[in-house]
Amino acid sequence: MTTRYWALGSAACLLALVHGVPAHGQGDPPATSASASGNTVTFGGQILMRIRTGSGGFTAEQRADQVAQRLIPILSLKNLKPEDVTVTQTRKYQDATISVRGKLLVTVDKGLSQANGNNDPGDLARAWADNLRKVLPEISVQANPNDKQQ
């Protein structure tokens, strides 16, 4: 079992424990299934991103593993909102990063952007961030309204 499978499986278990699974007849359980195949990072059956190239001595699959590992603490952040997902790029055609509430998720370099059909890493990072802005708030931990320490 690869680290990515373990990491995403752990995130699914964490979400199941936090959200709870309804008893029989109380509706559908929350979507917490996670999987990854090769260089594709998925959660709850939704593709988050495809890491098509290696970089910095890491293979594409190892980079996807890193993203999956970084995703676990991000998913434990309470009440994620679309604006919590940010893209940083200092200049056009330079590397871009995607962060969630200041936590680095992935760095998009020129090789990765070109392998995904983009010339500018910022364009690919913004496309991935748009997808994450839709998905992460749906699957992140929701704060208990009775919890006074939010």
Model-predicted segments: where are they?
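Core hydrophobic alpha-helical transmembrane segments of single-pass membrane proteins
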Residues: A12-L14
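C-terminal segment of classical bacterial N-terminal signal peptides
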Residues: A16-P22
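Bacterial N-terminal signal peptides that target proteins for export
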Residues: M1-S10
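N-terminal targeting peptides and non-cytosolic leader segments immediately upstream
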Residues: R4, P22-Q150
